[in-house]
Amino acid sequence: MKRNVYGIAIRAVAALGLALFAASAAAAETPPQLAGVKVIGAEEAKRMLDRGVPVIDTRVAVEYEEKTIKGAKSVPYREKSAKDVKFDRAQDQFDLSKLPSDKNAPMVFFCNAGECWKSYKASVLARDAGYKQIYWMRGGLPEWVAKGLPTQ
């Protein structure tokens, strides 16, 4: 009898854990749009980079040094808040002073695609700081690499 109760309890805990994991994985995807920010693909980001628009890698320095978009600038977003549209920006760190001083200047943010919230959050902070031409490459470095575009 005790074994049966323990077996049921173990299965229940395992099922609950799996359900919570699945729910958190589903919630981790960034939204497809962001008000006040234009979502773009890798080809458009490449055209903008070729015109001199800053392309900003929001990943940590180690990732930037390992591989990034050729010509991208590293401005790491240090993320501690939840991966959610209602994130607590007070928990995170992002140096807005490293962005162009002209708030009308265009800029592109990217990180590691849909599950990476750093570029999404950086776009929100830039928008809320008054920047007017924010572009978010939601597909991030994986999309860039898949298109065969240059990296360093």
Short names for language-model regions:
Residues 144, 151-152:
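Short, solvent-exposed mixed-charge patches
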Residues 30-35, 80-85, 109-114, 131:
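Second-shell loop/turn segments in exported
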Residues 2-66, 152:
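Flexible, polar/low-complexity N-terminal or interdomain linker segments that lie immediately upstream
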